[in-house]
Amino acid sequence: MKKGFRGTGTVERVDFPNKGIAVTDDGDRVIVKNTIPGQKVEFVVNKVKHQRAEGRLMEVLEKSPLETEEPCPHFGMCGGCTYQTVPYEKQLDMKLTQVKKLISDAIGTEEESGYEFIGIHGSPKKSEYRNKMEFSFGDEYKDGPLALGMHKRGSFYDLVTVSDCQIVDEDFRTILKATLDYFSKNNIPYFHRATHKGYLRHLLVRKATKTGEIIVDLVTTTQTEGINEEELLAGFRYALLTRHYDGRFKGVLHTKNDSVADVVKNEGTEVLYGDSYFYEELLGLKFKITPFSFFQTNSLGAEVLYETAREFILGDDRDSLNGKTVYDLYSGTG
């Protein structure tokens, strides 16, 4: 199989990280990302190394029997989610298979090495679970109107305005729509990755699941020619704070970033409203979080994770560590 070969195959499994193994009618195996076991797919080989071919997904010809869920309206174009058409329990089964294969490849099977596999602990919430999003400014097609959202699958430049994203709650969607409406009406240009010209870059939104506190950080360049920045930012603050939210605003921030890299980099932050931080709670502990804090993006899922670790430490004797301190030394905010 050579580079440029166009073929079809059926995905027999998906290995970590997101590598579908498609089998052709001739029995050849090709790695095709962003696929689901059971799908019949069309691909184009774009890499051959050590007799292993990797292909780019061109089209899903037949759905997998696993695909029984109605996806988010942006699914397919948006590059953020892969398995939304698969029921959550089946997603956990896929993860279990991948994790066990990784462990077996490293140390052998449970029988060979004697380890105990306790399974996959799922998230209490299956939708609207994220407490953080980084939206990008751009356009959905070349020279199109302003967009705010996620990158299209497989595209470095084009975006999808994810105004109905299902992995965040309505407050996130309201903030996205208010921001896009405001800057569109004011004809403010986004930072173009090719020309390195423009003002708008990213919108960071965080909301605490337990406390309901919200913080928003608008990331821009310092290219303010033709822009009354003070007036513009005052209008942005007003556009956000006059909408209805289930949570409550703790802060509106403005961060400057003139780096050419397409990453959120803090080169100076000012507070437009409120505070530069908010609080979230996990297992009775309170955490102070800023826009740039490392923190688990699924608060309720994080509680499951930490509670499991706590059970390992305590065992059957929960009173033995009463009043003692456990240090989590690789935990970001924690």
Would you name each region that the model predicts?
Residues M1-G334:
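Accessory RNA-recognition modules of RNA-modification enzymes
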